A protein has these predicted regions:
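Interfacial helix-start motif at the membrane-water boundary
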Residues: 42-60
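Extended, low-polarity transmembrane helix blocks
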Residues: 1-28, 52, 67-127
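Peri-membrane helix termini and adjoining interfacial loops of integral membrane proteins
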Residues: 26-39
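Generic secondary-structure boundary/loop-capping signal
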Residues: 37-42, 120
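Generic transmembrane alpha-helix motif of multi-pass integral membrane proteins
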Residues: 60-66
């Protein structure tokens, strides 16, 4: 296995585990956000099921990434979450400091996918 891909999987798993747990236990304070970002989050929070489901999914998928079990499944489930994190931080909270971690998460996801490309290749096969 490619070492960069494996390290990327572990780092991505740790990021999702830490921020998933933070979403439940809130050990990191939420930074001040622009009004547009607060409006967006307020809409999501008004659906009381959304954040517990999201954070539970992040924790479960991070455990899969860290354990090495069902990694392609975890990467596929986390892909739209990662893209939405990137879009939220680049569009609703502009600034290089806000986009650094989401960009790193996208790059880590791409690197982690490398070891599992034969599995993902089947998704793009013409039948």
């Amino acid at each position: 296995m490619n070492k960069v891909s494996t390290v990327s999987r572990y780092v991505l798993g740790l990021i999702y585990l830490i921020f998933g747990l933070n979403g439940i236990f809130q050990f990191f304070p939420m930074p001040p956000l622009p009004e547009s970002a607060m409006g967006f989050l307020g809409g999501l929070m008004s659906a009381s099921y959304f954040f517990p489901f999201l954070k539970g999914t992040e924790i479960l998928m991070s455990i899969l990434l860290l354990s090495g079990f069902a990694v392609p499944f975890a990467l596929i489930v986390l892909a739209p979450i990662t893209i939405n994190i990137l879009l939220f931080h680049t569009i609703l909270t502009p600034g290089l400091q806000n986009a650094a971690l989401p960009v790193a998460m996208v790059l880590l996801s791409i690197a982690a996918t490398y070891n599992y490309w034969p599995t993902f290749k089947l998704l793009f096969a013409k039948k």
